[in-house]
């Protein structure tokens, strides 16, 4: 189980990458790798935080009154839309690491 402090650290890392990508974009520089990393980190941080929240609440996490189950479902969407984490990893492998195209 991911602890709340770990979820917080992941969210802060994602936020910092978002800021770096935005700064590069505003400066007119290429930010493809940073933007993709930001999306990947944010999606993973969101999923980890939702999982921790659900685990902390136990069975009550599935009760509709607490909205936890809805947030849990929504965080899954961030890993698939608008671009899946698998495609992000493929982009990073090809454009950052110089590996051959894998899809």
Residue ranges and their predicted role:
Residues 3-103:
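Alpha-helical interface subdomain recognition
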């Amino acid at each position: 189980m991911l602890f709340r402090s770990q979820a917080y650290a992941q969210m802060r890392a994602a936020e910092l990458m978002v800021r770096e990508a935005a700064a590069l974009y505003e400066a007119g520089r290429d930010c493809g790798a940073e933007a993709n990393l930001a999306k990947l980190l944010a999606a993973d941080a969101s999923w980890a935080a939702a999982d921790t929240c659900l685990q902390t609440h136990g069975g009550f996490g599935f009760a509709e009154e607490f909205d936890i189950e809805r947030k849990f479902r929504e965080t899954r969407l961030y890993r698939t839309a608008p671009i899946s984490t698998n495609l992000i990893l493929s982009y990073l492998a090809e454009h950052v690491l110089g590996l051959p195209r894998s899809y």
